[in-house]
Amino acid sequence: MKKDTYNHVLKYTGLLGGVQVFYILMSIVRNKFTAMFIGAWGIGLVETYNRAVDLIANMTNFGIGFSAVRRLSELHEQGKEEAIRIYIRLIRSWALVTALFGTLICLLSAPLLSYWTLSDFHTTKGFVLVAPMVGILAITGGEVAILKGLQRLKQMAAISALGALVTMLLTIPGYWLLGLHGVIPVLLSTTAAVCLLNLYATTRDYPYRVGLRSMKLMKSGGHLLKLGGAYILAGTIGSGAELIVRSYVTNSTSLNRAGLYAVGVTLIVSYARLAFVAMDADFFPRLSAAGDDRKRRNNAINRQIDVLVLLMTPFLIAFALFLPIIVRVLYTSEFLPVVSMVLCGLSFMYFKAVYTPIAYLPLARGHSRLYLLMEFLYNVVFTVLVIVGYHVRGIVGAGIALSLANLFDLINISLVYARVYDFRFERRTLLRCIVQYALLVAGIGAATIANWGVKLLLGLPVLGLSLWFAWNLLRKKTNIVDKIKSVIGRKKQ
């Protein structure tokens, strides 16, 4: 049974993670040209717009993209085609309402957003122009919920890959031809392109229809708003925390430093996130299905932690060792100051790999208030630590603060959910986490050495040991060896 569980986790992490590798490759090319054409100042401006749009979107989408999935998934499993069509119409109707509402809120709050983020009203026009992004994101969220509810994982993977390609093809010429004047056109066009790709995928089987004039239909969607309440509040708190931090960095220094901070966060978070892509689409439904079965819940969580930690650690060690080269390749030498920040912040992703499967427990059990409380506590700690860290030691202090924030979340979640849900780390899982983290710390220590010969002499054996632990577990707990032999056998024929 355990072997089947490991195979299942690895399968869906591989399916969606493989797509994320392509997504990351496209992002690498896009970010390289973005850095060349608009520099750190331009990236700071892009991130300011994105964080503000995310905040308004999370405040106004009522969590429909999350709350609609469970009911649609149930209808899909029951094979009730007519009910599915009606429910999809309901999702789209409410998504359109929230799209219009969110766009209006962004338009009205444009002066406030400009003053809050940049301490003046000079970018009010910019926030007005990006307001349609809020509406487009709401519509996209509804279509993504439809794909998730219908369990179209392969379609979602294809859209993600194609979306990354289209985004790159729109971004590079946009910044090349227009420079900083291309920021808003690029943001709008890329957001719209991803939305159209999702609409194309869903409308092939379910043509786009809404029922805004049907009061009966609209009233039946009340549960969508209630179920998504905690999710939207948590998202708003998270987006608000990010915006507060980035506004502080901008206002206390400059958009240039905000751009460096944004790149540092991207390097810490974005390229390691492929390990998490199967969480919403695969792990969450399995955890929800466990219900009151404590043993089954704990087994699912521990298996997920095992896979995440063993995938994450070798990647982070390799990333740390070659980080100066990576920064030069992905961006320009202007961004080399972020190397120290990223090295200090890599533990952020490791701790996230450990606690994320545990953090899904209240959502899987329908305990929205507890989920919201935990998110609120984390974001308060995150905001305070990063602001203090940046104030004391600049972007390096911010990197240290990011790691400390997630260490706090790991300890807090583990203690609280052990009491509420009787969650327990399995002894072997806990031992794996400790060993792999010790290897990560050793790898980061080696990465701080300036001499490349000494750095690689000390760091590569650490990386090899981490890879050996990962391979040893996968060899014992999955049929990965048989699959590799099968692929090699087919190629020889």
Q: Where in the sequence are the language-model features?
A:
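Interhelical loop/hinge segments that connect adjacent transmembrane helices in multipass membrane
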Residues: 1-9, 198-242, 282-299, 420-434, ...
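Hydrophobic transmembrane helix module of multi-pass membrane transport proteins
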Residues: 9, 13, 22, 93-243
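Transmembrane helical elements of multi-pass membrane transporters/channels
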Residues: 11-31, 43, 163, 187-194, ...
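Membrane-interface helix-loop junctions in multi-pass transport and translocation proteins
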Residues: 35-42, 151-154, 164-196, 200, ...
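Helix-loop junctions and terminal segments of transmembrane helices
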Residues: 62-77, 149, 207, 264, ...
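Interfacial segments at transmembrane-helix termini and the short loops linking adjacent helices
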Residues: 110-130, 302, 320-350, 396
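Membrane-interface junctions at transmembrane-helix termini in multi-pass inner-membrane proteins
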Residues: 135-159, 346-377, 417, 421
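Membrane-proximal transmembrane or re-entrant/amphipathic helices at the cytosolic face
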Residues: 445-493
